[in-house]
């Protein structure tokens, strides 16, 4: 069963990822991932620090976006934070759920993206 979360309830790594990405601070974002982390984005999977650092560095400056928090949930060890993204990317507006799993030390172990629930 999902537990609903407020923005203030989100773990530090989730806030760090969103704030770091919005601030285009690649080093901050990279430091949030565990050594064996896995990110899946747009059909591509990135494993480990080297691949994830490449994903961050290639993506962090691609588009200018503004995020609006829509809601969050926790379910079976996954923290899903939903945002409305508006920016200069194709389509201009999208609602996404950032799906985080954290390790015991609070670092990001996995990150996936899905369409946010309506």
Report the location of each language-model feature.
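Short, low-complexity N-terminal intrinsically disordered segments enriched in polar/charged residues
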Residues: 1-27, 31
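A beta-strand edge to alpha-helix "cap/lid" segment located at domain peripheries
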Residues: 2-4, 53-118
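Short, hydrophobic secondary-structure boundary micro-motifs
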Residues: 30, 40-41, 68, 111
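Helix-to-beta-strand junctions that scaffold the AdoMet/dcAdoMet cofactor pocket
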Residues: 34
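A broad detector of the eukaryotic-type serine/threonine protein kinase catalytic domain
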Residues: 37-38, 116
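A short gly/proline-enriched turn/hairpin at secondary-structure junctions
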Residues: 38-47
């Amino acid at each position: 069963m999902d537990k609903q979360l407020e923005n203030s309830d989100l773990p530090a790594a989730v806030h760090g990822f969103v704030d770091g990405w919005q601030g285009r601070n690649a080093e901050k974002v990279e430091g949030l991932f565990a050594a064996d982390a896995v990110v899946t984005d747009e059909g591509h999977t990135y494993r480990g620090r080297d691949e994830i650092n490449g994903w961050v560095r290639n993506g962090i400056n691609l588009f200018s976006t503004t995020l609006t928090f829509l809601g969050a949930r926790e379910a079976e060890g996954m923290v899903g934070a939903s945002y409305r993204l508006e920016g200069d990317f194709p389509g201009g507006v999208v609602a996404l759920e950032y799906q985080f799993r954290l390790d015991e030390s609070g670092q990001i172990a996995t990150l996936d993206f899905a369409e946010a629930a309506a």
